[in-house]
Amino acid sequence: MKEQNTIEIDVFQLVKSLWKRKLMILIVALVTGAGAFAYSTFIVKPEYTSTTRIYVVNRNQGDKPGLTNQDLQAGTYLVKDYREIILSQDVLEEVVSDLKLDLTPKGLANKIKVTVPVDTRIVSISVNDRVPEEASRIANSLREVAAQKIISITRVSDVTTLEEARPAISPSSPNIKRNTLIGFLAGVIGTSVIVLHLELLDTRVKRPEDIENTLQMTLLGVVPNLGKLK
């Protein structure tokens, strides 16, 4: 029972220490939040994302005019292959050559993100760049080159463009609000951890209860601080 009370008193003291230094914690959090805001706004260069989407159906040109269940099922399995084709070395090299980009195929691949929504045959191609017009230009060129490559390799009848890439109006990164919030919370957590750490390392006797807990003896009396009584 005594040990349980000691734990409760210790926890209370830790909370009290945090509350006592709440102004310092708030100031540090505001400084780190402002630093994150300034870094995201003035140092990090914004990037823009343009996305184009294609629809591919595994349909053979033959006597059957419509789509069969087998065609649809095969198309679902092949979309992962399409993603690999889009990011293949041949496709990237052709895009770099056509647009005369000052990039290597590997550098271009780092700007590209290919996603395939679950249970669909739709492929989304997103390109990031610091210039919004350049991002859309690369995305549309990549779509055209990849479409021809997909048709020649997989023998599908057609690759349909669902959506052309357009220049983005607002940047996709950095997320200034999120970064500022992370900076603020990091300041709060970091300062709180330091305060708690210093409090736990402080072995000085500050209260009469500390003597009882340390020596396991009942305190008979306390000498008053005469300076505070004046």
Curated annotation (Swiss-Prot):
Biological process, per Gene Ontology: capsule polysaccharide biosynthetic process; polysaccharide transport
Pathways involved: Capsule biogenesis; capsule polysaccharide biosynthesis
Highest taxon of source: Bacteria
Regions annotated as coiled coil: none
Molecular-function GO terms, alphabetical: carbohydrate:proton symporter activity; protein tyrosine kinase activity
Keyword Transmembrane attributed: yes
A Pfam family assignment: Wzz
Stored PANTHER family: FERRIC ENTEROBACTIN TRANSPORT PROTEIN FEPE, TYROSINE-PROTEIN KINASE
NCBIfam families: polys_exp_MPA1
Name of the molecule in the record: Capsular polysaccharide biosynthesis protein CpsC
Primary gene name: cpsC
